[in-house]
Amino acid sequence: MRRFVLALLALFSLTAARADEGMWLLKLMQEQHLTDSLRKAGLQLAPEALYSENAPSLRDVVGRFGGGCTGEVVSPDGLIFTNNHCGFSFVQAMSDLKHNYLQDGFFAKSRAEELPVPGLTFTFVVRIDDVTARVEALARQKKYDQHTRQSAGVLAGLAEKLLKTSTLAKTPGVSARIVPFFGGNRYYMFFEQRYDDVRLVVNPPQQIAQFGFNQDNWLWPRHNADFAVFRIYADAQGRPARYAKTNVPLRREKWLPISLRGVEQGDYTMIMGFPGRTSRFLTASQVRLRCESINEPINLAGEAELRFMKSLMDSDKAASLKYAGEYMKLGNMVKNFGGMNASVASTRLLDIKAREEAAFREFAARSGRPEYRNIIERIDSLVAAVRDTLHDYNLLRFTYGAQDFHPNTAALSGFILRFAPRVQANWQRLDRGKKQIKAGAEEKKLYREFMTSAHRVALTTDFDYDLRKMKLLAPYWAKHHRLKAQPDFVRDDMNAYFDSLYAQTAFRDTAKINMYMATDYFEAFSEDPVISHWLLFDRLINEVYRPALDRYERKVAELNQIYVRGLCEMYGWTKAPDANSTLRMTYGSVRGYSPRDAVQ
């Protein structure tokens, strides 16, 4: 018997789903003839039950958990399910060695025991509008190129303006964001309502929730309880509100009932959520660039950093809790990038792309559209020119700049990389050799903020950890960077260099920090060894790599927009747009599979 199965999280499933290859935007169901395909696949619901802006639908029960995960409402009282790894960093931040909810788990026996989670939000999509014409009109008026019109700042400004004149302008908790689709050929504005009071209900113990840990990550079938349970709270009128004891569970008119019937071979199944990012419209050369100049250097440094962190975490319970979120985040990225490269090879994706490009060249010749001719070759030329620069840029970020990508770690190098640019940008132009740098009011304000942060860093940074990590990662840059770039970080004795750097910096001396806080001058900081080291890093990033990458991104945005438009025309606009952290749906049917010989 065929049954309709709505699968939003396959928490314990050992089955597989045979799916189509799209992450579909439900707003485009009619335009892309998706409803016919869904019915043929076995969907028994009306299309408006999936997505409707005028009546309750699945849009009302699937939301964005935190900044980018997916959750779903499974009760009329705001109970939500999500993946355990989605709540991982939030539960870590709530834990200490006495109440280690991450390692030991947590179970609220009543609503009174549910724990508020600082910083956690849950967001529902309220409406989606096509604003392509508005974006293009603004771009023509301001003479924006493709890169600029797709930039976050430009789109955020327009979204704010359009929200103010919309019917949702005064709805509590509603914001708007505009997102480019199909390589910048379409733009949609998402009206979203955010709830700020989300509380922890259930978190399985780590050994159960993360069984297999990164070895099983991105692989299926899975044998871990990768789930967590939270609840959304609102004020007495059901409006979004900050945490308050008087808040009540959010009442929802529609929710997902949980079925314990299981599934059978051939059952219809679908997934709704907020997938992060895909890049299915790339050329073969761009796929190769991603593999060789992004994934490979990041994996090289990332795997070394993971080994270093694990050795420390295995021997120290406090360190295990402190770095758990950072370790999971980095491990997830490394496994993803490594798996991506392996999949490109195993699926012979470059051969598939070559055939698609050949078909596109034939389409371009038939179309009579001059902008489509040689577009692939023009993209290939840009890629060839930037390949080594992009490789070294990523290698440098994840060796010398590794801490900057883990902001939850109060590490010295991360602090310098995040904050010092703001100070340097406001320094007056003068001879670096001067002992004192006189500053205006704005510079003095930044300096005070800088010194206050420096004092906090001096008290909280594990300098030995930071030093050991820098010594470990720096040689990877020395050995694997491709371009001869100046300034060069390679030293004859890297260990001695970093020992000297960390021994002499004022950031380790709270007395010096206090003394500097008492003055209005940037006294001596231009000569601090850590500042000097950061300035070398900054020069290499901003004077060598970023200008070349910015030129590439600006030029390739123009060409990608043309190429993706041509591909969509070739396919009759029947392809799903790339994932971009917006609400999507994919569907298929349940079936078993054999991942390797003798396993089914």
Where are each of the predicted segments found?
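Positively charged n-region of N-terminal signal peptides that target proteins for export
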Residues: 1-4
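Terminal presequence/propeptide segments associated with secretion/organelle targeting
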Residues: 8, 15-600
